């Protein structure tokens, strides 16, 4: 049985390291990207089962990257990974779920596995 492959698009090394560590420990295979463009290339080139996507990326917004990901692979779950504040209701209309950067990734495992 192959591990679920998760693409993490996050430009902060400390968050990326924590996500990778926790997802690896839970049995996920983690692919890492630090820009929206890099994430889109990996999504196009590799089999990816789910995406954790930072909203504030250096080259694009999470909404723009998510829209392109859904164009490429309409059924892929794309979960927002960010500090959620007053923009929560607006942003969540565009994503399948979300993970606050202060939470443990286990809270979204069910979303990644569907």
Regions found by a protein language model. Name each.
Residues 48, 62, 90-104:
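As written
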